[in-house]
Amino acid sequence: MLKYIIPTIMLMPLTWLSKNSMIWVNSTAHSLLISFTSLLLMNQFGDNSLNFSLVFFSDSLSTPLLILTMWLLPLMLMASQHHLSKENLTRKKLFITMLISLQLFLIMTFTAMELILFYILFEATLVPTLIIITRWGNQTERLNAGLYFLFYTLAGSLPLLVALIYIQNTVGSLNFLMLQYWVQPVHNSWSNVFMWLACMMAFMVKMPLYGLHLWLPKAHVEAPIAGSMVLAAVLLKLGGYGMLRITLILNPMTDFMAYPFIMLSLWGMIMTSSICLRQTDLKSLIAYSSVSHMALVIVAILIQTPWSYMGATALMIAHGLTSSMLFCLANSNYERIHSRTMILARGLQTLLPLMATWWLLASLTNLALPPTINLIGELFVVMSTFSWSNITIILMGVNMVITALYSLYMLIMTQRGKYTYHINNISPSFTRENALMSLHILPLLLLTLNPKIILGPLY
């Protein structure tokens, strides 16, 4: 495990000792090397976990998320270059240090073996994200967004700490590998209802569950590009990862408690998809589409069948790459037109044909076109939900239609139509941006050929 943690820590002195001309080259190249070494984690067997030490372990659930985390740092650095070109050298270095520390915390969160360590690192990811949003965001509303983000996350996760201390006192251990064998069945009593809520609420706020999702569009819209990318791609997946890990302790209580949350998610999935159709702001649309995709994951995790677990993990990875790519595309529009309003960016296909190709690919993966892994994840979730209750197929079908509608609406609004007069003098697409998009879409296309490596521990 240290072969990922120590190089990540050494990125910080590398950044601070680099000259102004070399700072982006050094940090991006080194982080790309780290992300390529992370591919070695694919080399493990499906049914056992790699116990690195008494502190860290990884199994086939955390491995894809780990690789996604490490893959994202060079992409965030590539995407932020234009955004930071006006800043002075110290601020650039500070920004890169924030991204590196965020990656460090995330790697340790996904591999932590003790639940308390997991909780501490889960909270630690809040700090760099908050600094990135409130310091480098675009508008002054970023402070409001940061406050929402901070208080939703903190209020959600304080009960989790109390619940973990209670579990530590009753069971005697918070080790993931021990808990599988030591855990007592949780029967339904009032105290256990509150324990279940305390354990799940932190992750449901993070996912986010419909109704607790208000911080997400604000944070996404106000964050700089790197903040949006890491928030959509990895920080939302922390909620899903935590839920998959902690449902182990809460059986058979989940069978009784899951109903209202499944209903809320199925309803919220349709509602947020419909909200997407009425958005004028490009980033806000992508943020709401994230809520609707994550609602599927919540439903899948709460149903607790092997198929739904596989669907949830596949959908999390697919959505991480897709939404990150969409945010990059929205940012490349924003850098040229200086506005996130979709109406002001019409007809870009005639000016930037290669960018239009990336937009098409990203929109199609977002609406879960076969044979992408987005579709594989969604199909697994839909089938397992259908076998749980037949009536859900109506809601799922409506959701798929609306998802296709808003994805194509986003594509048509930005690419087609007669272009407005103020975009006659925009710059062409850079090699940096094309490399960035291809590094997002290549993993998606390659995973299409071999999706079993992201289907989680139950495959």
From Swiss-Prot:
Keyword terms, alphabetized: Electron transport, Membrane, Mitochondrion, Mitochondrion inner membrane, NAD, Respiratory chain, Translocase, Transmembrane, Transmembrane helix, Transport, Ubiquinone
Annotated GO CC locations: mitochondrial inner membrane
Membrane topology, record value: Multi-pass membrane protein
InterPro entries the record matches: NADH4_N, NADH_Q_OxRdtase_chainM/4, NADH_UbQ_OxRdtase, ND/Mrp_TM
MF terms (GO), sorted A to Z: NADH dehydrogenase (ubiquinone) activity; ubiquinone binding
Keyword field contains Translocase: yes
TM ranges: 22-42, 60-80, 94-112, 116-138, 147-167, 196-216, 224-244, 256-276, 284-303, 308-330, 351-371, 393-413, 435-455
Top enzyme category: translocase
Keyword Nuclease carried by entry: no
EC numbers on record: 7.1.1.2
Pfam families the record matches: Oxidored_q5_N (PF01059), Proton_antipo_M (PF00361)
Superkingdom of origin: Eukaryota
One of the protein's GO biological processes: mitochondrial electron transport, NADH to ubiquinone
Protein's cellular compartments: Mitochondrion inner membrane
Catalytic activity, as annotated: a ubiquinone + NADH + 5 H(+)(in) = a ubiquinol + NAD(+) + 4 H(+)(out)
Family of the protein in this entry: Belongs to the complex I subunit 4 family.
Record function comment: Core subunit of the mitochondrial membrane respiratory chain NADH dehydrogenase (Complex I) which catalyzes electron transfer from NADH through the respiratory chain, using ubiquinone as an electron acceptor. Essential for the catalytic activity and assembly of complex I.
Quaternary structure and interacting proteins, as annotated: Core subunit of respiratory chain NADH dehydrogenase (Complex I) which is composed of 45 different subunits.
Record-given protein name: NADH-ubiquinone oxidoreductase chain 4
Organism: Bos indicus (Zebu)
